[in-house]
Amino acid sequence: MDARIDQVVTTGKVTLDDEEYEVESNTYIVGDDDEVIVIDPANDAEAVLKAVGEREVMAVICTDGNEHKLSTVLEVAAAGEEDEENWAPIALHRADRLLWRDFFGRLAREEEDEDDATALRSLEPDIWLEDGGVFEIAEAQLEIVHTPGHTPGSVCVISEQLGVLFSGDTLHRGRPGAIGGVYDDLRKQLNSIGALLTPLPKDLRVLPGQGDETTVGEEDARWESWGALARDGEDA
């Protein structure tokens, strides 16, 4: 059966540099009537799992390690299963390991049960994403592209079969992706976006981590003008 893409929009909060920002995030569920891969379950696990329904979650891909994505990842991977051996594998790029450890370390400090706290502190992703890595679901391939800048371990996901680029928070419609207008390493992010877009078909759909969809051609035409954002940041 051919793969399809379901989208879930959720809202939540994320804290960066002691500032709290409200975010509206896109989660994408890729698969068929039986099996799916979930890309960026954010903010609201219940809403994501409702969209998954009775289908089996085969993997959970996080395009970066920011807290609004990690906050639901265990619940979505479990998908109602109590036995951890039956949970879907969680995938994250190793360069965001510090963000992962910081988030679950904070959860551990809030946990009253010491065994549970120890488990949270020792928790690691099941799969470390690598540039060029491929997942398969419902006869579609999902290729990982490392796009550092938004975070050190940010990735995008390309599927030629589905004609789509899942750009996470690396690239939003009309601008480089950011949370609350805050950029981690904008120059590196812009370089990643340029390298990402250049070889891709101009009509390829772009499904971002926040906001409306766009196309490679639309964003490629805007890319050079974004260099002013990086220069302004250096002059500030």
Language-model segments: which ranges?
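Conserved beta-strand hairpin/beta-sheet module of binuclear metal-dependent hydrolase folds
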Residues: D2-R55, C156-G168
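Metallo-beta-lactamase
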Residues: V36, R106, V134, Q141-A236
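Fold-independent oxyanion-binding glycine-rich loops
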Residues: T11, P41-A42, R94, D131, ...
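Residue-level detector of conserved, well-ordered beta-strand and adjacent loop positions
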Residues: V9, G31, E130, E136, ...
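Hydrophobic/aromatic beta-strand patches that form the interior of the parallel beta-sheet core
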Residues: D6, I61, A91, I127-L129, ...
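Short Gly/Pro-enriched turn/cap motifs at secondary-structure boundaries
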Residues: D18-E20, E124-D126, H146-P148
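Active-site HxH/HxHxD metal-binding segment of metal-dependent hydrolases
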Residues: V23, D44-E136, A140, R222-L229
